[in-house]
Amino acid sequence: METDSMECVSSTGNEIHQNGNGHQSYQFSSTKTHGGAAAAAVVTNIVGPTATAPATSVYELLECPVCTYSMYPPIHQCHNGHTLCSTCKVRVHNRCPTCRQELGDIRCLALEKVAESLELPCKFYNLGCPEIFPYYSKLKHESLCNFRPYSCPYAGSECGIVGDIPFLVAHLRDDHKVDMHAGSTFNHRYVKSNPREVENATWMLTVFHCFGQYFCLHFEAFQLGMGPVYMAFLRFMGDEEDARSYSYSLEVGGSGRKLTWEGTPRSIRDSHRKVRDSNDGLIIQRNMALFFSGGDRKELKLRVTGKIWKEQHSPDSGLSIPNLSSS
């Protein structure tokens, strides 16, 4: 991590020096039950839309006792009828984790057929998802479900925290010590004493609250090809569909010149690396950055300003009219 100064300047002129912070790892508690041996049973019940949880006994039968995830074909079993998923069969070196007998290559076709007859709620039903799916279609939906938790947008580490937006905002503030601002305009300054040395991890993050939403402003320096570049971009703390309701602009300049960028913030559903690697933001090459810095061009002094606004659709003209008021 670079040790040079990275400063966040709020609209009111207060300066905050932000460096790399340590982080803590957390996990949500789970109340999952571990499945046992497969039972010889015919299951005909379908979980209806008013149910609050899957049929427990059936769900347990389809839960791998090793990884506790739902099992999908091929489902394996030992001679005593204990089942596990194909991934865990390799992990346990072909030995049943329940009775220690050799697994062989026996498939539990009966349990696979039972699964075909089931309809189950999305696993995010307790977060508000009302959808019911055939067992083998459920996994695909859950990977894209709008009610699934968001991943922590902090870019300086592999943080595994997930949760809803209010939880993540508190997590960023309290655990990652991220700078928080209210308002839709920003004024940031990035200062580096030796602009010829750049680590890929040199970056800063600020969270803005406006229009009742939260936005993450990223500013980073990283190596691209033979030289360093500096990039700024905005991410929306919510889904992509809602992100399209907002726009933002970024501007960097100096010595009578300026470079501007305007775009739509990306949802934090897209990973930080995905956004960065797509070049979807304001990108400043080192020579241009030094030109904007002025002076003898031996020290980098970049000031990035910008604003966020909400697009308002005009029913008469069909055009989008920017709303610059953050209240």
UniProtKB/Swiss-Prot annotation:
Residues 114-307 are annotated as: SBD. Induction: Induced by drought stress, salt stress, osmotic shock and abscisic acid (ABA). Zn(2+) 2 binds at C152, C159, H171, H176. Zn(2+) 1 binds at C122, C129, H141, C145. The keyword Mitochondrion does not apply. GO terms for molecular function: ubiquitin protein ligase activity; zinc ion binding. Its EC number is 2.3.2.27. Pathway: Protein modification; protein ubiquitination. A zinc finger (SIAH-type) spans 117-177. Residues 1-27 are annotated as: Disordered. It is found in: Endosome, Multivesicular body; Cytoplasmic vesicle, Autophagosome. GO terms for biological process: protein ubiquitination; ubiquitin-dependent protein catabolic process. Changing H82Y: Loss of ubiquitin ligase activity. E3 ubiquitin-protein ligase that mediates ubiquitination and subsequent proteasomal degradation of target proteins. E3 ubiquitin ligases accept ubiquitin from an E2 ubiquitin-conjugating enzyme in the form of a thioester and then directly transfers the ubiquitin to targeted substrates. It probably triggers the ubiquitin-mediated degradation of different substrates. Modulates directly the ubiquitination and proteasomal-dependent degradation of FREE1, a component of the ESCRT-I complex. Interacts with SINAT6. Interacts with WAV3. Interacts with FREE1. Interacts with ELC/VPS23A. PANTHER family: E3 UBIQUITIN PROTEIN LIGASE SIAH, E3 UBIQUITIN-PROTEIN LIGASE SINAT4. Belongs to the SINA (Seven in absentia) family. This is E3 ubiquitin-protein ligase SINAT4. It comes from Arabidopsis thaliana.
